[in-house]
UniProtKB/Swiss-Prot annotation:
GO terms for biological process: translation. The gene is rpmF. This is Large ribosomal subunit protein bL32. Residues 1-59 are annotated as: Disordered. Belongs to the bacterial ribosomal protein bL32 family. The keyword Cytoplasm does not apply. NCBIfam families: rpmF_bact. It comes from the Bacteria. The keyword Nucleotidyltransferase does not apply. Pfam families: Ribosomal_L32p (PF01783).
Length: 59
């Protein structure tokens, strides 16, 4: 089992964690409807990459 030799100071601990922050989810704009949606996901209107792939209630 691994055991640390020396205690890591709060400064070094913070530097180690500095890249663990969350980033904003990348959004894409649907070319057909102009809606924003998560990348690689179907838009709320049922469009994906310019094509209708899911029937919605409005159809």
């Amino acid at each position: 089992m691994a055991v640390q030799q020396n205690k890591k100071s709060p400064s070094k601990r913070g530097m180690h964690r500095s890249h663990d922050h969350l980033s904003a989810a990348p959004l894409a704009v649907e070319p057909t409807t102009g809606e924003t949606h998560l990348r690689h996901h179907v838009s709320p209107n049922g469009y994906y990459r310019g094509r209708k792939v899911i029937k919605t209630k409005n159809d």
